[in-house]
Every structure is written in structure tokens, then in C-alpha cells.
Amino acid sequence: MNGKRRQAGLVLGLVLLFAIHASCSAALAQEPTDWVTKFPREPVRVSAWPGGKKVALSFALFVEVFGFGQGPVLRPDLMSRNPDLVNEAFRQYAIGAGNPRVARLFKELDVPLSIVLNARFPATYPAVWKEFRALQPAAPIVAHGMNNSNDILPLGRGLAEQRDYIHRTLDLIASTTGVRPTGWSSPSVYSNGDTMQAMAAAGITYNLDQMDSDTISRLKTPDGTLVLLPYPTVTVDMGQFLARMKSANEIETLWLDYVLELASEARADPAREATTVVIGLHPFVVGTPDGAAAMRRVLSRFKKEEAVWLADTEAILKAARAN
């Protein structure tokens, strides 16, 4: 009797073990889920970029409009003034002098630049936009909402409103620039699952809201698939400049360390996947003479780095699809 019980217990144990194994295997077989949107997200495997490069590096300049009295602040202690001439001058200088200066620098050094554009910018600053676009006529345009202050994504108001907002943004950019963007960057990197689904439905194919990886991934929304290009939090110049009080020279060091370390890792392990970095630039930081000088040194150094491929966002997307 005891022998039969032991045999039955052994059989039951094996059945339970098999069930647990099967359950674990099924769980592992499921696609990973994006931690924000809860949509399936999978890596895009890239062994190497064109020319055998291992680090794809793109610089994206944020060409934004805020409205008088709104936007980034250099001197919070002076905000109570009316008019706040110091902080408004900080913004207007960046818009009128900073944007063209960055465009000229990238043209001079023959480095690809991507434009992350608020839809209202060309009509609000037509002369600045004309000068800027003449310097960078072929740079891809990434949609960046209507403006960067009081007309941003309507989060929390449902999918339909986000769809309408994205369509209006794309329509306005198309009407003022002649280009209908296929890339998107949410104003202030503030988006959710509805945003991703709405942009896929609108024909957007890639976005710059991914801040948690060194490699490209693919997000599967109910209305289509989006390619997520890595846009690291720590490499955004504006955050380092205003929130962490870093100078242009300090940001220069950060960028060099960040990208060259990825290149060093690739040399140490040639079999590792190729990586991608999209660095966000703002004219408040790199559009001043000292900021442009730091930017010049950064670009000159990266042009000499054999492992780094300098490309715009659309070139990276095309190369990733070819892998």
C-alpha cells in the first residue's frame, strides 16, 4: 500500500513539475511588454550600422515656440518682474540667433541634423524659419506638437482627442513646410499609450520618446507599429543646463564620455549589438557662441571616431529596417 502511495506521489510530482515548466515556457514565449504603454515591445536587432560602425549617433535640434512670458527660465529670481526682460531675452535670443547658428555649424562641419519642430514655429517666426531651413534644406522634420507651453498633447482626455491633436500638428507642419513628418517627439517627452496608438494611426513610423535603452525597439500598438529610437534622458542638453546647472563645457564632456564609452564597449565585444543615441539639442544651450564652440569640438571629435556613424533620424530608421 505504501509503495503504491509513493508511486502515486511520484507521478503527481512529475505532473506538477511538468505543469510548472510548461507555464514558465509559455510566459517566456510571450512578447515583452512596454512598462509605460503596456503594449508589446520587442528589440530590433542590429549587428552593425553602415560601414561596420557600432554606434549610430544623431543630433536632433528642438525648434520650439513658447509664447511671450512662457518657456525656459534662466533666472527664476526675476520671473516676478513685468515685463521679465531677462528671461524673455534668454528665449528670444535662442530662437532668433541660436537656431540659425546651430544650423550653420552643422552645415559647415557637414554633419547630419534632424529638426524637431513645433508646428506653430514657422508661422510665428517666418523669417527665422526661412533662414534656418535655407541652411538645412534636407534635414528631416520630426513633429513636436503645436507648441511647447499651452498647446501640448491632451493626455487624459481620451484617444480621440489625441488623434485629433496629432493630425492637426501634422497638417499644420505639412502646410507651412511642405513636409509631412513620419517621426514624432512628444512635447516635454510627455506621452502615454493613447499617444502611441494615435501616432501610429496617423502614419507616424518612429518616435523619440524612448529614454530607457541603448538599442532600438519596436512597439506594437493596436493601430500599427512604431520604431522607438533611443533618446537618453541624461544626454539632453536642456535638462543638464537648467536642472543640473551644467555649463556647455561640462555637457561637452558628458556627451564625449557617453558616446565614446559605447564605442569602447563595442570594441571590447565586437559581437555585441550595435547601439543608438539620439541627442537632444536646444538653441538656449548650443546656440550661444560658447555653446556652439563646445558643439564644434564635440562634432569634430566624433567625426574622427571610427566606431561612430553620424546620421539623421531617418537614415537610422532606414538602416535598421535593412538589417
Language model: regions and residue ranges:
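N-terminal secretory signal peptides that target proteins for export/translocation
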Residues: 1-7
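Catalytic alpha-helical scaffold of carbohydrate-active enzymes acting on polysaccharides/glycoconjugates
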Residues: 31-183, 188-227, 255-279, 287-323
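Surface-exposed cleft-lining segments at the edges of enzyme active sites
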Residues: 89, 180-181, 240-249, 283-284
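A conserved mid-domain beta-alpha-beta active-site/ligand-binding segment of alpha/beta enzyme cores
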Residues: 230-261
